[in-house]
Amino acid sequence: MNPATGKFEGIMAGEMADFLRHQRALGKRFINEERGLLLFDQYLIEQKIEAVTKITPELVDAFLASRPRSRPRSYNHLLSVVRRLFKWLVRQERWLQSPVQSRPRHATAAQTTFLFDRSQAQQLLKLAAELPDNNHGRNRGKIYFTIFALMYGLGLRVAEASRLCRQDVDLERKVLVIRETKFLKSRLVPFGPKIEARLREYLQREGALGPTTPLFSFAPDRSKPITSSTVTQTFHALWPRLGLKVPAGAASPRLHCLRHSFAVGTLLRWYRSGINPQQRLWDLSTFMGHVHPASTAVYLTITAELLDEANQRFHRFAAPLLKEVAQ
């Protein structure tokens, strides 16, 4: 690997580049996966592998061992990248068989996601709104308040919210245009009166902005949008000040928990409105920018409230049948 260019240079450089192009042609960003392939490419160079016959199961195991991962999920992701590369090469008939024989690590008991209820989210927004300006940026309170509100109220990813430009906010039609998201697709996200009011207030405070001007920026000339990492750091700085207790079995709160909270909150509202969530999961999946409802299902942490609503729904469905059986 050439550190300056980030290009593959080892014995499998051509195969890796072709695999990466194929995946991106399917609409995948493959950013983290590319990093994993670059690590493997660098390892092959360091080991002076100059013939593909030298790429054995033992070599793959040695590569994985050279990249210690404390969490099973991280290890399994790296293993998956290498495994997918060779599976693709076998399907393309460029390799006879895959040298990857390593098994995934078993994850420990999965922790649940911390979910913000309405009052907790309001606490976070209040703290964000009170953030003072500093040497690194002005209008910090309004910027972070609005970004967190968009994530909690519309389920946006942090990168989607932070990259918004003025032209992406259509107050007349009440929609946001989310451009080239995680899967290189764009989508429209409608918003209600509360989000509209917050966006109007924010835009009035900011004054006239050009169509491509970033909505959220600390740059004096507004040439660059706020970064996702900056928003994440601010969230983690605010979290201890909330004084909230993390339930037993729940993971430490992350900024992405706001998006999870939106998904679970939507499901709960559907239950309470008598809407069948199974019939609307595609709608939620599209709204959140997923390519398949299976991806959305990951966000739907089962809570006591959801279990209670699902139980009530089952009893309403089953009551007539149980009555017939009892007669």
What function would you assign to each model-found segment?
Residues 1-327:
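Conserved catalytic core of the tyrosine transesterase superfamily
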